[in-house]
């Protein structure tokens, strides 16, 4: 296993792993390279997705997820399995076309996010907690889903 915070010694072993798990869009190019060069297969998903989901009834809910693309898509797949009616993802950063689903949106600025929330009729929003105050009129459930590139925080409040 090698990931953020590991030293070069761990990264040097990348060609010997049995499978890569791509947890961010930024890692996709490296995974493709390792597959092409060494035959190492890869999967794209966030393995800890259930830790991000509070125990709620998602049945019939319309959900917006604003996060990096792999985490957002992993949350989407889990919510759809739990009965969500629709799940749309959006993000400000790298959006790989091979990870896009119909309705996914690349945000240019805060106004894009505000407009999406105002016009989206969402029941639930998953996004970094610092974004909650951008849409004080949102009456649904806001779930703080930490996004380091947005708030600069890895964990905590």
Task: For the regions a language model picked out, list residue spans one by one.
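An N-terminal assembly and electron-transfer interface module characteristic of large anaerobic redox
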Residues: 1-157
């Amino acid at each position: 296993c090698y990931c953020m915070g590991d030293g070069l010694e761990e990264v040097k072993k990348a060609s010997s792993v049995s499978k890569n798990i791509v947890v961010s869009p930024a890692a996709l190019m490296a995974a493709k390279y390792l597959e092409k060069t060494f035959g190492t297969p890869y999967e794209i998903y966030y393995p800890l997705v259930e830790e991000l989901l509070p125990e709620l009834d998602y049945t019939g809910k319309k959900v917006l997820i604003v996060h990096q693309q792999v985490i957002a898509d992993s949350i989407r797949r889990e919510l759809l399995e739990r009965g969500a009616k629709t799940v749309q993802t959006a993000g400000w950063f790298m959006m790989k076309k091979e990870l896009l689903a119909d309705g996914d949106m690349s945000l240019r600025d805060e106004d894009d996010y505000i407009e999406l929330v105002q016009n989206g009729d969402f029941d639930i929003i998953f996004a970094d907690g610092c974004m909650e105050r951008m849409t004080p009129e949102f009456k649904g459930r806001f779930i703080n889903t930490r996004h380091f590139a947005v708030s600069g925080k890895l964990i905590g409040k």
